[in-house]
């Protein structure tokens, strides 16, 4: 279709033909939003404070505006569609809220257009969120749907944006959504949605933990609500869900209306009386995390009728994504694992607990999260720690309090002096890569080279050198993938 219906359904209000819409953010998401709004007959104006981002929009004939000017003109817009990076505290969005102008995200726009039939019969949305495990679970879910012969597309925070896939002939969408996307998707009501777990994260974006949790809870407002019962916050969200069908999953034996583990097999007692799905040993993701991801994906797949055989086939052939518990090398009895995607303390704890003896490479940007509970839980697995990144002092302090016998090395990068010179641990060492850097290396590469070399000196045969940073990467790297590649490069250098 190339235009909005003549009689605009309530689900699209206030979006209608000719409606003036402010698109907040001119990058990739903003480009997709502006294109869709233009296609369906609205009148978008693109807002960004970077002239480079506005230029392509202006060349297409769209009006553009700076954020300060948009604030002054905010009452002239019927709607604001914001990119996920815009928090509610952003002056532009705060002004829109104060003026009573509705604010949607790109996911909200996609949901409403799909629900209104603008792309044909609406798809069934199967949505996954949680602090950790979203990408693996959503990818597993998609594989299960395909193995079951269903026409499904992987999208959202993984693969393609939802707006970009609505023209595809799919009946089901396997959608990964972040808390940012969910915050700006207030009307989302998926066919089925899962909350894997809830832990402190992104508190630099959300004003409070309660707001972060409330955003995640939006996936549980549809027909089927699924949540991890081993996580107290996720379990509480399931208890409060308005969904007609509520399903839990756990590592232990399942009760009625649950999926779980019995006799080393995944079992469904929610969508069947007692159906064995697959052996735990066939799950390629290591540790309890892999079992939980498979249970969540299976619950969503079973909610739309995917048979057990297809679920087992999909899991058995599943391949873990890059930088997610990825074994980089095994040398001299030491295993080197890249879990750079463990970008918060909750994820790092799960990663460490998957191995019996770990030399832990950690640090980065903690985004306001505390590590004390996580370090206390993993202390017995740690045989050493190498700390990197801007917030490594917080990691050092948690180790000092909860794992005082664990040797620690801290890697300093040049002018970065935000860390105390020593910490209260039996073996403390500070390495300054600026004093011994290699020509042509970036700061991140130099830091990782020193970190892996230090970890190798600590490790013994049978140990795992594990990159599970517990923080974001943007202080020293371009992203978690860049950090993981730097780790792999450093590992190859140290084992040759």
From Swiss-Prot:
Gene3D superfamilies membership: Mur ligase, C-terminal domain, Mur-like, catalytic domain, NAD(P)-binding Rossmann-like Domain
PTMs per UniProt: Phosphorylated by PknA.
Keyword annotations of the record: ATP-binding, Cell cycle, Cell division, Cell shape, Cell wall biogenesis/degradation, Cytoplasm, Ligase, Nucleotide-binding, Peptidoglycan synthesis, Phosphoprotein
Pfam families referenced in this protein's UniProt entry, alphabetically: Mur_ligase_C, Mur_ligase_M
Subcellular location: Cytoplasm
GO cellular component terms attached to this protein's record: cytoplasm
One GO molecular-function entry: UDP-N-acetylmuramoylalanine-D-glutamate ligase activity
UniProt record similarity statement: Belongs to the MurCDEF family.
Subunit structure: Interacts with PknA.
Function: Cell wall formation. Catalyzes the addition of glutamate to the nucleotide precursor UDP-N-acetylmuramoyl-L-alanine (UMA).
Protein name: UDP-N-acetylmuramoylalanine--D-glutamate ligase
Organism: Mycobacterium tuberculosis (strain ATCC 25177 / H37Ra)
Gene that encodes it: murD
